[in-house]
From Swiss-Prot:
Topological domain ranges for the Mitochondrial intermembrane compartment: 39-164, 219-311
Keywords: Membrane, Mitochondrion, Mitochondrion inner membrane, Transmembrane, Transmembrane helix
Protein purpose: Plays a role in the early steps of cytochrome c oxidase subunit II (MT-CO2/COX2) maturation and is required for the stabilization of COX20 and the newly synthesized MT-CO2/COX2 protein.
Protein's name in the database: Transmembrane protein 177
Description of how the protein assembles with itself and partners: Found in a complex with COX20, COA6, MT-CO2/COX2, COX18, SCO1 and SCO2. Interacts with COX20. Interacts with COX1, MT-CO2/COX2, SCO1 and SCO2 in a COX20-dependent manner.
Organism (species): Rattus norvegicus (Rat)
Family: Belongs to the TMEM177 family.
Biological classification of the source: Eukaryota, Metazoa, Chordata, Craniata, Vertebrata
Intervals, Mitochondrial matrix compartment: 1-17, 186-197
Entry keyword Glycosyltransferase: no
Disulfides per UniProt: none
Family matches, as InterPro entries: TMEM177
Length: 311
């Protein structure tokens, strides 16, 4: 066993710089490839297929999307490919400035028919939704968005794509990997560990890996939270209607999550908090800005716009 481990250690020591560069490039490439080649991957994942056929984008949804693009002032040369998605919220990927463009999935529920029809079967986490139950009625109401709320939801995705935030979000992994490697190598040189036993260096490397992962988790979550807050503020700053739509959008998300919490029973309690936020997968991480925080932030913007002092 010592032979293969020793040869592996020697190989890593000899080619550590090349391995580091390759690993960093690989981490960046894997994350960015989803946005460099969004079509048809994203559409395959989120396309709405009623009765076994892909649903074409309706004139109503296309008009809504064009209205949002006009409000934001998207340059005519930027490429967007909207499609009808089965999700409750819009989805997007890509870089509209590049030839491959960006894709935006517009929820079919924006048409209203899927929500108002109580005979339509919807299965969430393996359970059929009873639209006539109190929780089902609340969920149906939460999925019905006003025109302003729909525009905010779509505009948020367009602002995200136009800003290039996707590229920024791919940086923590390679940066933390390179930083962990550089600091650990420098520390081992300073402590003289390269002249000591391999077991001691292995233990030090293990500690460095743990510290590096903690740094990655903290930096990635902090960046995500900051960008989501900026994204909401930037979208809401388009007009008072977008602020109002944003408040409604997050109110409806919280209401829908509370309805799902009731519909799914114990599983729902594991997925959603009593306030309607999503329960983090890991206790030590905050993967996203809480919906209550996002709603309250926009609510403050709305109150500032309608206050007498504003005029």
């Amino acid at each position: 066993m010592a032979g293969p481990l020793w040869r592996a250690a020697v190989f890593i020591q000899r080619h550590r710089t090349s391995l580091l560069v390759g690993s960093c490039v690989g981490l960046f490439g894997v994350q960015i490839s989803f946005h460099l080649f969004p079509d048809p991957i994203v559409q395959w994942l989120y396309q709405y297929w009623p009765q076994g056929q892909p649903a074409p984008l309706s004139p109503q949804l296309r008009s809504l999307f064009q209205e949002v693009l006009k409000d934001i002032g998207v340059p005519s040369g930027h490429c967007y490919k909207p499609f009808t998605a089965f999700t409750f919220q819009p989805v997007s990927a890509g870089f509209p400035q590049l030839p491959a463009g960006a894709v935006v999935g517009i929820p079919a529920i924006f048409l209203g028919g899927l929500v108002t029809n109580i005979d339509h079967t919807v299965v969430i986490h393996g359970q059929k939704v009873d639209w006539q139950s109190p929780a089902g009625t609340r969920l149906r109401d939460a999925l019905t968005l006003s025109h302003d709320a729909q525009k905010f939801a779509l505009a948020k995705e367009v602002v995200y794509l136009e800003s290039g935030m996707a590229a920024l979000q791919t940086l923590p992994a390679p940066v933390c990997l390179a930083g962990t490697w550089a600091i650990s190598v420098g520390a081992k040189h300073a402590l003289g560990l390269y002249g000591g036993p391999m077991s001691l260096r292995a233990a030090f490397n293990l500690v460095a890996i743990v510290v590096g992962y903690v740094a990655y988790a903290f930096s990635k979550d902090s960046l995500t939270v900051a960008l989501e807050g900026w994204l909401d503020h930037r979208t809401a700053s388009l007009s008072a209607a977008y602020v109002r739509g944003g408040v409604e959008f997050y109110e409806k998300i919280l209401s829908g999550n509370l309805a799902l919490r009731s519909l799914l029973g114990r599983q729902g309690e594991k997925l959603y908090t009593p306030s309607g936020n999503i329960v983090p997968r890991h206790w030590f991480r905050i993967n996203h800005l809480p919906y209550t925080t996002r709603r309250d932030s926009l609510l403050q913007m709305w109150r500032a716009k309608v206050s007498p002092g504003h005029f």
